Amino acid sequence: MSHGHSHDGAPCGGHHGDDGAGGSRPSVNDVQALVDQLRLAGVDVSNMPNIPTAPRDMDEARSKSFQFWSTQPVPQMDETVPADVNCAIEENIALDKVRAEPFSLPAGFRWSNVDLSDEEQLNELYNLLTRNYVEDDDSMFRFDYSADFLKWALQVPGFRPEWHCGVRADSNNRLLAFIGAVPQTVRVYDKTVNMVEINFLCVHKNLRSRRVAPVLIREITRRVNVTGIFQAAFTAGIVIPKPVSVCRYYHRSLNPRKLIDVRFSHLSAKMTMARTIKLYKLPEETATRNLREMKSTDVPQVFKLLTTSLKQYSLAPVYNSEEELAHALVPKKGVVYSYVAENQNGKITDFVSFYSLPSTVMGHTTHKTIYAAYLYYYVAGSVTPKQLINDSLILANREKFDVFNALDLMHNEKIFSDLKFGKGDGNLQYYLYNWKCADMKPSQIGLVLQ
């Protein structure tokens, strides 16, 4: 399997040109265009000097200086946090001491909240992300977040409109950059912290030499601080100071012919297409008894089941209300899919969910979209995780997904080989802003960010 295609729901995502060149040198955009042309011509650009690409692994990151992140309250690359340390890096600021006025943008640009309840603005954000958001390293695939997905991810209970933070051009009012934050209580080891999740940092390709991303990060930090929240969680496909955990994507083919056609994956040596299709063929029916789509009336039971299960992990969400959980997990067609199994007494014993995040295929004549399902939260109570996840493969296949993706967090890694998942080439780093604690193994992570 290739193309780990990691989420950069994060400050300094892989294609945002944060710590790149500026001044009179060619812009990051110019250099990136050249890099893309060289890549297309088959040239290995990974060892070329002076090309400002974001580091994709820890070793590469240790040798890099981070102009922006070295100024932020995050552990630095060479820092090892002892096991008994689990606390904020900077003390909370008194609210009357938090900067009251927005940070300055370059001339010709202004701040503008994006109102996702307004169809026109929602579509503007959709178009910005569709054309400028995360691509894989070979520029073959780009995430295609639907408008419904954006509302689901950003309009969570307790969301604040000013945390949907856009930048517009004065000249034509065009939306050119965005960063989003949503409230989320997170438990880190034994401490429960009110945080925000940061997501959808995106800067228009034409603006990437203007160092807008650091200003976006500073501004969303200010807007969050004003409300008395001083910590954040986010993920990124690149390495910046300093991940609390490094997870890896795994992929399970559901439609191998299409995935091979678009070069998401390739035929293994000595394998024919017919044998590959046979290898990945799934049963028609699920194995878990009484497995059905989750309903809103199931929320109280799923709330108890999931809340208990998440206690085993060192980094996990804390649902403060059934309303929060209902928003995240009650099925929404084309966005989130959730299923429960109940016993003879009507007690829910098992639960599994996945969300839909398609990718646009760049420049393919036949296929325009890969339909990808991502494993979300689950609790295997009466059956093994292996059986429950295999059932979710069957359910995703029934919904016509092409591939089923999962990270090696929770207990996932133990079941990947049996269920024919292949290791992806993309890591997903987990980050905490203004918090330091000991590093975590992927199996300690119970927080899944879209």
UniProtKB/Swiss-Prot annotation:
Its EC number is 2.3.1.97. The keyword Ribonucleoprotein does not apply. Transmembrane segments: none annotated. One of its GO terms (cellular component) is cytosol. It comes from the Eukaryota. Its main location: cytoplasm. It catalyses: N-terminal glycyl-[protein] + tetradecanoyl-CoA = N-tetradecanoylglycyl-[protein] + CoA + H(+). It is found in: Cytoplasm. InterPro entries: Acyl_CoA_acyltransferase, NMT, NMT_C, NMT_CS, NMT_N. Belongs to the NMT family. This is Probable glycylpeptide N-tetradecanoyltransferase. The gene is nmt-1.
